[in-house]
Amino acid sequence: MTKGKKKQTVELDLNKVEKLEHLMPVPKSRQSSITSVESEDGSLKEVLKPPPRKDFEDLASFESYIRDETWDNEFDYCHAHLTYYPPFVLKEVHDDIEKIKPTMNKNSSKFRRNLQHHIQRHLILEMEKCCGFEMDFGKAKMEETPKNIIWRYEDSGDHGFPKEEEDKFNRHWKLELEVSCNNENPLVQVDYKAIPV
């Protein structure tokens, strides 16, 4: 008889995550992500490849990845994608996915209201705690189609670091956050990118 695999959970205590105090030089491993591209005038230009995408199915793993990238000094070069049932849905169905109602989707004003609250008051704030630096996404640009709603956030600010420190280590980056839901089920898609500028 073989033992079944245990589901691994990632321990993450948001109250014990340390704040990123100072920037450091770009990691040497980033050199492998630079490629040469021919420009319009025929000369070769060095370009940074987009960060590889990591996929997650639970919020704790997603947040742990963001925390780990910060402490691996890769906070400005990562791409994470999360597909999950938001906590307010799981709470309503008592963690039994079989009890999910067909009306729990983007067409329900209650679902939309709860999702917007979750994004603003929980998701973004928890991501900020995990990454250890300031996030200022501001107001989202909302795009709605008959099949889905997408909220797009962008932060091109200084992330709480002095300009001199960013210039010294050449650590300028922008953050993009895209949250979407559809008209078929309550699954939410979160796409987070940190891209050097």
Swiss-Prot record:
GO terms for cellular component: plasma membrane. Keywords: Cell membrane, Membrane. It comes from the Eukaryota. It is a peripheral membrane protein. Pfam families: RGI1 (PF10843). It is found in: Cell membrane. GO terms for biological process: energy reserve metabolic process. Residues 22-50 are annotated as: Disordered. Belongs to the RGI1 family. Involved in the control of energetic metabolism and significantly contribute to cell fitness, especially under respiratory growth conditions. This is Respiratory growth induced protein 1. It comes from Clavispora lusitaniae (strain ATCC 42720). The gene is RGI1.
